[in-house]
């Protein structure tokens, strides 16, 4: 089943019922995704990034795709170690993969992202 998508059962049910969702992922998709992850975690690549570029990491701490927050934290830590000066990490307790589709939390998360973006625009 696809319970990993959302803590909200109605979101999971909607996903299952939607004929446009749930297509099988191809080997090529996984290959490209894993290549991107490895590329983005190589310190030599991270050190080439603009150190003043703000980066926001948001995820649910129960998202198995991000190893329940561990993978996101590792990426955040790697960015910081590479000298990125403005990295922010926000893990939402109890939430899974589709944090912006969590009906009970979407407004709060959207507001958090908006607040973060606006604060960077003011600099």
Regions found by a protein language model. Name each.
Residues 58, 72-73, 89:
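Structured catalytic core of nucleotide-sugar glycosyltransferases
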Residues 40, 80-123:
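Catalytic active-site module of serine/aspartate enzymes centered on a nucleophile-bearing elbow/loop
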Residues 16, 73-80:
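Class I S-adenosyl-L-methionine
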Residues 1-58:
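Alpha/beta-hydrolase
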Residues 64-74:
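Conserved alpha/beta-hydrolase "acid-adjacent" motif
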Residues 57-65:
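Conserved strand-to-loop "acid loop" that flanks and positions the catalytic carboxylate
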């Amino acid at each position: 089943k696809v319970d990993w998508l959302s803590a909200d059962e109605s979101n999971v049910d909607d996903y299952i019922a939607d004929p446009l969702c749930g297509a099988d992922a191809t080997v090529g998709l996984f290959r490209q995704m894993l290549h991107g992850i490895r590329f983005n975690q190589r310190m030599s690549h991270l050190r080439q990034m603009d150190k003043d570029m703000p980066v926001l990491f948001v995820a649910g701490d129960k998202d198995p795709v991000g190893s329940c927050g561990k993978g996101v934290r590792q990426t955040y830590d790697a960015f910081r170690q590479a000298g990125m000066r403005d990295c922010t990490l926000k893990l939402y307790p109890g939430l899974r993969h589709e944090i912006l589709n969590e009906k009970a939390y979407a407004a709060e998360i959207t507001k958090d992202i908006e607040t973060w973006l606006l604060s960077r625009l003011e600099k």
